[in-house]
């Protein structure tokens, strides 16, 4: 946002070669110390992560979506994720990703909106914004909309369409409501499986931690 305020025109220029669409390194992804906070979930080396996860633990959500943006030439991405999945991810966590993904797809299909799933974004590394919730019993997912720091207010894509900030907001809003709807429709099962997750792992947590000592969930 600060970069666009400094470089954007009063009338948005959709040409991707213009200054307002060419944010310099390191962009807006990192914190002040150039640390990628979307790789810090399990390690919690940064203050921002520590405070965010303190709040997370106060709520312990059953379903958690990590909203992102990607290249402005990409269609929308939502769950389910691509393999590999870590073997500690439960069958229910896999199943409900598909339930939510199918509901998102229904809404996108009705509006003839482009999207993809099962092709990118794994669930193996434990410190992402979607995998940290998964290793804490939730249904964790990443949603990615085209745009990012290069999107500005409006930009022409490689398909010669014009992608606007308004469109980006609307698509995230749409998947948000679709996710809430799918969760509501399966609320009893969501609650039961969340409880089952912790009942199971409180019994054999030490065994699992010893077997998978390459990372720890704090």
Would you name each region that the model predicts?
Residues 48, 52, 100, 172-179:
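Alpha-helical packing segments of well-folded alpha/beta enzyme cores
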Residues 1-97:
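Active-site/substrate-binding loop(s) of hydrolase catalytic cores
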Residues 19-28, 72-76, 101, 191-207:
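Short, composition-biased local secondary-structure segments
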Residues 110-218:
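Hard-cation-handling environments
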Residues 45, 93, 97, 101, ...:
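Generic structural signal for well-ordered, non-membrane alpha-helical segments
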Residues 51-72, 95-121, 126, 133:
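Active-site-adjacent substrate-binding region
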């Amino acid at each position: 946002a600060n970069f666009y305020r400094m470089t954007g025109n009063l009338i948005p220029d959709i040409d991707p070669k213009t200054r307002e669409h060419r944010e310099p390194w390191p962009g807006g992804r990192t914190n002040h110390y150039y640390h990628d906070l979307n790789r810090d979930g399990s390690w919690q080396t940064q203050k921002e992560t520590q405070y965010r996860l303190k709040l997370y633990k106060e709520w312990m959500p059953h379903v958690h979506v990590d909203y992102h943006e990607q290249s402005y030439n990409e269609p929308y991405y939502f769950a389910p994720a691509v393999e590999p999945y870590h073997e500690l991810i439960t069958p229910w966590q896999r199943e409900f990703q598909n339930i939510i993904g199918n509901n998102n797809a229904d809404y996108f299909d009705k509006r003839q909106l482009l999207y993809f799933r099962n092709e990118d974004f794994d669930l193996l590394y434990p410190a992402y914004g979607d995998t940290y919730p998964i290793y804490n019993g939730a249904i964790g997912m990443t949603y990615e909309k085209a745009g990012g720091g290069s999107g500005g207010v409006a930009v022409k894509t490689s398909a010669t369409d014009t992608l606007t900030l308004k469109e980006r907001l609307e698509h995230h809003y749409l998947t948000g409501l679709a996710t809430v709807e799918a969760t509501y429709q399966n609320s009893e099962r969501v609650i039961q499986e969340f409880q089952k997750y912790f009942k199971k792992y409180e019994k054999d947590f030490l065994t699992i931690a010893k077997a998978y000592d390459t990372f720890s969930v704090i």
